[in-house]
C-alpha cells in the first residue's frame, strides 16, 4: 500500500450534493511525507469517485493506478472475482488475461485479477486515510463519518475476498500490518458502530440532491451484510445472526425505503431498479439504499455500469440503447435453470436465424416466435428472468458442451439496461447512465429472512421471502423454508450484482462437490474443488514488499 501513487485530481463527477467540487482540480500527486495544498471539498468528491471512476481523464488516461485502467475500477474488480467463478456467468473470451483461471477456479498466488482487486482496495483505503487524517476537526463529523464508511466498505471487501487485509487507519509512511479474520471483522464491526450515530439519519440522502452519499441506512446495510457472513469471516468463532436481523429491522422500521413494485411504461418494478434513469425514477430510488453514481456524460469509465451493460450485449440485440457491444458475459445454464428447471426457456432455433436484419426486423421476428424477453418472463412466471433468447446477434444455445467460449453459448442477460423507463433520451451511446445499487432494500428482506432461518424463526423467514417473490410476481412459496430455498432466492433476486461467490461460500456450496456447475474445476459438468479457493491469494508482490503480510493457506 505504501508504494501506491495517490492522485487526487478530481474528474467531473456526479457530485452527490457537492456541486462545487465537480471541476478538474489538477492537484499534484500525494507524497505521504508532504502535505500538498488542495481543495477539501474536491477531495471529498474524490472519495466517492473511487467507486465509480478510474482516473482523472474520463474512461482512459491519468488513471488512478498503473494497471489497465478499464479493468481496475472498484465495481469491476469486485464483480469479476464474485461472479465469473460461479454458476451465474461465463466470460466468452477465454484467452483474456487470467480469465481461464477465474472461470475454472484454478488461480494461484500470481493471479493478475486478484492483484487488481487488492491494489484497488488498497488505493481507496489510502486515499480515505489521508482524508480522515487531514480533515478531522476541519469538516463536520457526519462528513468524516461518510469517508470512514467508505473505508469500512473497502476493508469489508478485503475481508470477503482475501480473509485479511494490509491494515492501516492512519496516513503516514509506516507499512500496513496484517489484520486477519476475526480481528478484521471486529474492527469493521466496531468502526461501523462508532460512525452510525454520526451519519445523517436513515434515508437522508434518498433524494436527487444527495443520492449516492452514505447516510445511516448505508451503514446499517453494510453492518447487516457483515453480520450475516460472520461465521465465514471469523472461521466460526462468531455467529452474529441476531445482529444481522436487528440491523435489517432498523432499516425496515424506518419507513425510508420501499421495494419498487409498480409497472411503468411497460417496465416492471424490478426492471426499473436497473435502468438508466434509476436516479430520477422515484420508485427505483426508494429501493436503492446506496448507489454507485453513473452518468454517460459525466462519469465515463469501463468499470461500472458501462461494463455491466456492454459486456452482456452483442451487436444485433434489440432495445440495447447503446452502440457499445463487447459480447463477453453470458449466462451459465445453471443460472437459467433457477428460473427454468426443465430448460424450457423460450428460444429461437437455428432455422429462425436472420441475416443482415434491421432492429425492427429482429423485434418482429422475436415477437412472431414468442421469444422476446417479455415472453421469457411470462413463461418463467417471474419478473426477474431478464434473459434474451431471440434472433438478434445470433442463435443461442443453453449447452456449450465442452466449450466455455462463444457469447451465444448461453442466454444473454438483459437485467442491466441503459434505457430510460420514462422514455427520455440516454445521455450517451457508449457510456451508461445506470446507477449501480450497491445496497438495496431487497437485500435487507433476504438478509433478515436468512438470519431468521438460522435463528430458528422459520415463519418470519417465510414472510420475508414471500414479500420478495410477490414483488417479482412469482408464485409465493408456502411450505417450509430450507437452505435450498434461500440460496436459490438469493440467486434469482441478485444474479449479476457482484455477490454470488459470497452467498455460495456462506451456504458451503462454493468449494467441495456438494454443488457442481458447468466448468467448476475446469470440467464440463463440474468437479469438486479445494477449500483453499474460498479465499483469494495475497499477491506475491505485496508479500515481497511488505514483510508484515503472509500468504493464505495452501497457496
Language model segments and positions:
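Conserved, well-structured interaction surfaces
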Residues: 41-45, 49-54, 89-162, 174-186, ...
